[in-house]
Amino acid sequence: MANGKVIQVIGSVVDVEFSADSMPALFNALEIPRDNGKMVLEVQSHVGNNRVKCLSFTPTDGLERGAEVIDTKRPLSVPVGRNTLGRIFNVLGEPLDNRGDVKAEKTMPIHRSAPAMDELESSAQVLETGLKVIDLIAPFARGGKIGALGGAGVGKTVLIQELIRNIATEHEGFSVFAGVGERSREGNDLWHEMEDSGVLPKTTMVFGQMNELPAVRLRIALTGLTMAEYFRDEERQDVLLFIDNIYRYTLAGMEVSALLGRMPSAVGYQPTLATEMGALQERIASTKQGSITSFQAVYVPADDYTDPGVVATFGHLDAMIALERSLAEQALYPAVDPLASNSRILDPQVVGEEHYQVARDVQKVLQRYKDLQDVIAILGMEELSEEDKLTVARARRIQRFLTQPMFVSEVFTGRPGQYVSLAETIRGFKEILEGKHDSLPEQAFYMVGTIDDAVAEAKKLSAA
């Protein structure tokens, strides 16, 4: 028989039997015709006796043994090209926005090889984000991979939404957003925000959210990546790829691994963790044709940075933004820890001597303040030397100046968002380090844009 039939159904795992001469290849998409459309499966393993074990992308409710299964003879393929811009898709490439079918130029399989070594090209060009703490401490490389790491509720999604607003608005190319195992409400909010800001016509969005089956959450990142690869390779564009959240991709892999009966490894993760992460991350690359700059939110379970699921991501990142709960508790937003965040291109040969020196001096002052906090807690400020008192005062001003009102949180805070250029960021911190603003109150530096805004705020406070 050319087609197969369902032998066993356990949750979202379906066993299908084929004849010996028509066995489907691994990762082939299989279809089961249903009254209300079709059910799509993906072949995961050959288990012997002409049987294959598959994972379903759609709920298996009502599926019975003996149902006919059709081999599409190719991996799951999704629409790509300019007609996907401004639209929202699911893992199968079907539109979710009730705006009719997509007339795509072509479709591409979601399983592809990474670019060959001789096609790769790395850039050392800084991509300005308009966020002071990131541009100063962990500058982004155009065509690089950037990770925003943090536990639950410290602001990863808000930060990634702000980056979409700042960079996609300023950026000329196309953007792809992949929602991987996150909240549907946030995806809905993001869609409306992007529509209001005028960014949506240059953006393709794909969603496989928390309520979806594990196979969907595992493959949705590949669907988004395939669409981004088309813009890079065929359109020769510089593409922005946003993934929220890459940890949910790992978690979906863990669920799939358990469903397929594989032996778990450390902390219950799948034994193929590094391979799966590498297969995804190596495809997010910049070639001679174009670049993919990726921003990935990384959930850190229980704030444990040694968790294998988090560690698997580290080695692939060019810049790492660590979001710290203690800063969020003090309402210092964005809650980026300037001492734990880093970037491959924070190098005087790339960013220039002045930027490098100011960034390192800021970190030095903040580190000294951190070292002195135990002394201050036990003995009080009076016991510090004059030099240390000055360091603490400047560190507290720097801490507050690292905060910034965001465009995407205007509705919550009532403060208009601020985009600060890199030159203004460097000037502001340099003046604080030089002591030009030692006379201004600390509060004047909180939630302002440029250093001139801080001076204006200080005048307002003194007049009050």
Curated annotation (Swiss-Prot):
It is found in: Cell membrane. InterPro entries: AAA+_ATPase, ATP-synt_VA_C, ATP_synth_F1_bsu, ATPase_a/bsu_AS, ATPase_alpha/beta_chains, ATPase_F1/V1/A1_a/bsu_N, ATPase_F1/V1/A1_a/bsu_N_sf, ATPase_F1/V1/A1_a/bsu_nucl-bd. Transmembrane segments: none annotated. Gene3D superfamilies: 2.40.10.170, Bovine Mitochondrial F1-atpase, Atp Synthase Beta Chain, Chain D, domain 3, P-loop containing nucleotide triphosphate hydrolases. It comes from the Bacteria. Its EC number is 7.1.2.2. It catalyses: ATP + H2O + 4 H(+)(in) = ADP + phosphate + 5 H(+)(out). It is a peripheral membrane protein. The keyword Nucleotidyltransferase does not apply. One of its GO terms (molecular function) is ATP hydrolysis activity. GO terms for cellular component: plasma membrane; proton-transporting ATP synthase complex. Keywords: ATP synthesis, ATP-binding, Cell membrane, CF(1), Hydrogen ion transport, Ion transport, Membrane, Nucleotide-binding, Translocase, Transport. It is an enzyme of class 7 (translocase). It holds the Pfam family ATP-synt_ab. PANTHER family: ATP SYNTHASE, ATP SYNTHASE SUBUNIT BETA, MITOCHONDRIAL. F-type ATPases have 2 components, CF(1) - the catalytic core - and CF(0) - the membrane proton channel. CF(1) has five subunits: alpha(3), beta(3), gamma(1), delta(1), epsilon(1). CF(0) has three main subunits: a(1), b(2) and c(9-12). The alpha and beta chains form an alternating ring which encloses part of the gamma chain. CF(1) is attached to CF(0) by a central stalk formed by the gamma and epsilon chains, while a peripheral stalk is formed by the delta and b chains. Belongs to the ATPase alpha/beta chains family. This is ATP synthase subunit beta. It comes from Dehalococcoides mccartyi (strain ATCC BAA-2266 / KCTC 15142 / 195) (Dehalococcoides ethenogenes (strain 195)).
